[in-house]
A protein has these predicted regions:
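Substrate-binding/catalytic cleft of secreted carbohydrate-active enzymes
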Residues: 402, 411-551
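Extended acidic/polar, glycine-enriched regions
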Residues: 199-203, 265-361
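Short, positively charged and aromatic/hydrophobic N-terminal segments
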Residues: 10, 17-21, 26-29
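Conserved, mostly hydrophobic/aromatic
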Residues: 178, 234, 335, 371, ...
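N-terminal carbohydrate-binding accessory modules
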Residues: 248, 338-404
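Aromatic/hydrophobic beta-strand junction motif of beta-rich domains
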Residues: 165, 262-268, 371
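Short strand-turn-strand beta-turns centered on an Asx-Gly dipeptide
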Residues: 175-181, 279-280, 344, 370
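Accessory beta-strand-rich segments of carbohydrate-active enzymes
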Residues: 32-39, 44-51, 62-66, 80-84, ...
């Protein structure tokens, strides 16, 4: 069979077809391939099934390389694509779309807008006025499916193969060579899957179905344009036999900031030597027979998330920095760190990190950064490009950061979801304080549908079937972004009323990362759990109330 290319197409209902375009014969050779484990409406509508076979969350590494083999291969570019109005409707003919990108934004450029258009609603849900649904139910008539397909060639020296979807709106299922790989919700955090058992040497076929609405859509009622698609980069990656799975950089200071203690808590799979170089100092340790990996707080177990465990070993390195150059928006000092993994003296993997040293705390009624009062002069920022929607280029992100700095803005709230990691990297480097916000907003359940705050409508409240789905979103964000010095505050989300689950989220943040504060504006609306937020804020305050407060 000739080399598979973007002209290869796959998957029809429960079955898969590979069409290999023969340039010389100008025709298609069709190979039938059954597709196992089709996604059902019941799965999409179940709030307790929000991920299947998704790997444990971990820190984002901007710089991870190996001299032996390429660790990451980008799948960005043109993909084969087709579209259906719902799970039972017929698919369109095959077309091509660009990844990353939104289906509806690209549909605008095609005659007749065949894949729909962006849809703006504020506090309502996008199905309001079309179908009457209760929380967890999903539209039956209009719930479009975007089916993406492309081929890839497995590098000869890869012993393992993983897939990373950096952003899929709002749910995605993955197959490789017709074999079901996994399922994910939570639009704005990465989902990783192990495809090693499904791939084979040479050419492979990858299929991703993206569903516009799922049960998680009830948790994503942000005031923005509603769209769907693979809107952030898609990557394949492999892991060397000795691999850094995760790292959490922690720090503490002498009371007068004359010295800092910096600890690198690493999780490593495989056996060999782990070496950390930081501030001109080097430490190393041997790792041998690994212990079973426990990712700590685990949400979505059982059917929703089968045990996905890696054999890893914990190892920590602690350094002392005398007279540290502290990080702030005015002076965003960054130290470089390198974590090298070696076996018998040969370098297996290198990970570079930039570390900002700062202490953020609440004393009395004041927030202090490095012992001094801090005032946020900030903005709420949606990810947005007028041409591509929430698929924002690196050039556009840099333009945003430079213009914010030029206008004396020093803080950004990632309203109302985790931003692209590159934007956070820029905030580290240029100096912007960040409130990292969980991908959670249920405005339409409590303000429009459940105005009395009843449990029948309001999400998440204390409803047990939604608890793990909500808490997993907090975990995914924290684990990905925990090493960014720019992030000073974790946010529990936006306009989701109140209740026990939000309080549990705030406690998870404090327990896992006591170096940051926790914010949730919604305690102003629901005082049942006031400890959910470390500080109180209020949106849309009338001018008269502000004058009264300042008097």
């Amino acid at each position: 069979m000739p080399l598979l290319s973007r002209k290869t197409v796959v998957l029809c209902g429960c079955f898969s077809y590979i069409l290999c375009y023969n340039e010389s014969r100008k025709c298609c050779e069709v190979t039938f391939m059954p597709l196992n484990h089709p996604i059902t409406p019941a799965l999409l509508a179940d709030p307790e099934i929000f991920q299947q076979n998704r790997l444990p969350f971990h820190a984002h590494f901007a710089d991870q390389t190996s001299p032996e083999l390429p660790l990451t291969v980008s799948l960005d570019g043109e993909w084969n694509f087709r579209y259906a109005e719902n799970l039972t409707a017929p698919f369109t003919d095959w077309d091509t779309l660009t990844v990353p990108g939104f289906i509806q934004m690209q549909s605008l450029q095609k005659p007749g807008q065949p894949y729909g258009a962006p849809h703006y609603v504020n506090t309502q849900y996008p199905w309001d006025g079309h179908e009457k649904l209760h929380p967890g139910q999903i539209p039956q008539d209009y719930n479009p499916i975007g089916e993406y397909q492309r081929s890839f060639t497995l590098p000869e020296n890869w012993a393992s193969c993983y897939l990373r979807l950096n952003g899929a709106d709002s749910a995605a299922a993955v197959w490789c060579n017709g074999v079901y790989i996994g399922y994910t919700e939570d639009t704005f955090t990465p989902a990783e899957f192990d495809m090693t058992a499904a791939v084979h040497p040479g050419e492979n076929t990858l299929t991703v179905q993206v569903y516009r609405f799922c049960s998680g859509s009830w948790l994503e009622d942000q005031d923005f344009w509603r769209m769907s698609g693979l809107f952030r980069s898609v990557e394949l990656f492999t892991k060397p036999e000795l691999h850094l799975e995760d790292v959490f950089v922690k720090q503490s200071f002498a009371e007068d900031f004359s010295s800092a203690t910096v600890t690198f808590d690493c999780k490593v799979s495989g056996a060999g030597t782990v070496s950390v170089v930081f501030n001109g100092q080097e430490q190393s340790a041997e790792v041998g027979e690994p212990a079973e990996y426990d990712s700590g707080v685990v949400f979505g177990k059982g059917e929703a998330d089968p045990d996905v465990e890696e054999d890893v070993q914990d190892v920590s390195f602690t350094f002392t920095v005398e007279h540290p150059a502290l990080w702030s928006a005015e002076q965003p000092n960054l130290y470089e760190a390198e974590i090298a993994l070696l076996r018998e003296g040969a370098l297996m993997e290198r990970t570079g990190l930039k570390v900002g040293l700062r202490r953020f705390e609440l004393k009395g009624r004041q927030m202090l950064l490095n012992g001094k009062r801090i005032v946020f002069k900030g903005v709420n920022r949606h990810e947005w490009s007028c041409r591509t929607g929430r698929t924002v280029s690196r050039e556009e992100m840099l333009w945003d950061v430079k213009n914010l700095k030029a206008h004396n803005v020093n803080a950004v709230r990632t309203s109302h979801y985790p931003d692209d990691p590159y934007f956070l990297q820029l905030c580290d480097e240029y100096g912007l304080y960040v409130i990292g916000e969980t991908n959670l907003e249920t405005h339409g359940t409590w303000q429009k549908l459940g105005a009395d705050g009843s449990d029948e409508w309001t999400l998440p409240g204390a409803r047990p079937e939604w608890r793990e789905n909500v808490l997993a979103r907090a975990e995914a964000m924290l684990e990905r972004d925990k090493n960014h010095p720019a992030i000073l505050i974790w946010s529990c989300g936006n306009e989701s009323y109140g209740g026990k689950t939000l309080w549990e989220m705030s406690e998870y943040f404090r327990r896992t990362d006591p170096s940051r504060l926790v914010h949730y504006e919604g305690i102003f609306w629901n005082r049942e759990y006031p400890a959910t937020s470390d500080m109180e804020s209020q949106m849309y305050t009338p001018v008269a109330d502000i004058k009264k407060f300042l008097a």
